[in-house]
Every structure is written in structure tokens, then in C-alpha cells.
Curated annotation (Swiss-Prot):
Species name: Escherichia coli (strain K12)
Role of this protein: Upon overexpression suppresses small RNA (sRNA)-mediated RhyB-silencing of multiple RNA targets; overexpression leads to partial loss of RhyB sRNA and other sRNAs. May act via Hfq.
Null allele phenotype: No visible phenotype.
Keyword Signal applies: no
Segments forming domain N-acetyltransferase: 1-148
One GO cellular component, as annotated: cytosol
UniProt-listed Gene3D superfamilies: 3.40.630.30
Protein name: Uncharacterized N-acetyltransferase YhbS
Lineage: Bacteria, Pseudomonadati, Pseudomonadota, Gammaproteobacteria, Enterobacterales
Length: 167
């Protein structure tokens, strides 16, 4: 298994994985549109020994109170059903966080199960007076600081790219 930055030839495999992993094709369309419009900050794939995409995570820019603070949102994260339970999601997330830290990004936000994401260092964004536009997500919206001062004096609405409006 190999984890690496996605390349153009991976797009069909990523699309197929996302369509298999989620109830609708919304996530596949989201990644396609972010990629096509140049708003995919980082996409990482996990491939098997034959080069087939078996895992994927995407990161795209977010604004806080309308400002670009070098924050990104992590979504979607998917692992092929046959490879779940082997730590592949953890490896994808950690590789992404490490790369983003090296690139100088300040923080990462995500929507998901706190029991899962807290293991990666995410904490509830509401504890820092941060929220996203979707009502009822307070218990799922989380933040991970990459820079020590990323959360200093930062509060308010975290806005994802308009392509996320489909959700």
C-alpha cells in the first residue's frame, strides 16, 4: 500500500471510491468540482499493490469570518470497505495534516464523529466559539490546530467553498 498526492490518472478511481463509499454521488461531484475549479488544496490517495485507489482524503480552503487565515476543511475521507479497520483512514489523515503543516497552513476543520476525529487531535470547534453554516452540526464540527497560535483570537463562522452548498 502507498499513500501519495493524487495525480490526474487517479481521478476515475477516486470518483469510483467516493460513489461506493457514500449514499449519493454528492461527494464524488464535490471533489470533481473542487479539482476542476482549482479549489482542491490537497488530495491524498492510498493505493493497493496494483495501483488501485483504496482510500482518499481531500482538503480545500475555508474562510473564517470572511478572512483567509490559511485554514482548510477536510472532506471527504473514504476508505474502500475491504480495507476498513486497518488504520488506513488514520494514515491518510496524519499524512494530510503533516503535509499541510509543512506547507504552512494554520488549522484544519472537519464535520464528523468526534470519537473518530478526536483520535487525530481534533476538538470541538464550539469550544473555541467557531461554527459552520449547517444548523445542528455543533457536536460534529471540529478543528485541529497546525500552528500554535491558529486559534488565538479567532471566532465566528467558518465558511467552506460554495461547492459545499450541495449538502
Amino acid at each position: 500500500m502507498l499513500i501519495r498526492v493524487e495525480i490526474p490518472i487517479d481521478a476515475p478511481g477516486i470518483d469510483a471510491l467516493l460513489r461506493r463509499s457514500f449514499e449519493s454521488d454528492a461527494e464524488a461531484k464535490l471533489v470533481h468540482d473542487l479539482r476542476e475549479d482549482g479549489f482542491l488544496t490537497l488530495g491524498l490517495v492510498a493505493t493497493d499493490d496494483e495501483g488501485q485507489v483504496i482510500g482518499y482524503v481531500a482538503f480545500s480552503p475555508v474562510d473564517v469570518q470572511g478572512e483567509d487565515l490559511q485554514w482548510v476543511g477536510m472532506a471527504p475521507l473514504a476508505v474502500d470497505e475491504k480495507y476498513r479497520g486497518q488504520g488506513l483512514a488514520r494514515q491518510l489523515v496524519y499524512e494530510g495534516l503533516d503535509s499541510l503543516n509543512e506547507f504552512g497552513y494554520a488549522a484544519v476543520v472537519t464535520l464528523g464523529d468526534p470519537a473518530l476525529y478526536s483520535r487525530f487531535g481534533f476538538e470541538l470547534a464550539a469550544h473555541h466559539d467557531l461554527r459552520c453554516r449547517w444548523p445542528g452540526t455543533e457536536s460534529a464540527f471540529q478543528v485541529h490546530r497546525l500552528a500554535d497560535d491558529a486559534l488565538n483570537g479567532v471566532t465566528g463562522l467558518v465558511e467552506y467553498h460554495e461547492h459545499f452548498n450541495r449538502f
